[in-house]
Amino acid sequence: MLMTMTEFGRTVHQNGSLGTDHGRGSCLFVLGNNVAGGKVHGDVPELLVKDALEDRRDLPVTTDFRSVFADVAGKHLNIDRSHDIAMFPGWEGERFKVMT
């Protein structure tokens, strides 16, 4: 089992230095046995649609990373859903189903 993610996303549009700035939306990769693989999970915004970007530059956050982590912990490490609040204090979301 391997999960990888960045701590921040990148803006879609370039800044004045022809680079990009820290953004909100990002991606997370989950690889291994029992992963519902071969597809992109979640919502992928259409970048050419008017108002698809936040502040005309950021991908919107569509999935809370904790929901993916909780699903992987639950299925891969056999951690019961009742322990999600201990893993992520204050979080009350639902597990995002990436595991089979």
Give the label of every model feature segment.
Residues 1-100:
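Feature marks hydrolase-like catalytic cores characterized by long aromatic- and Gly/Pro-rich stretches
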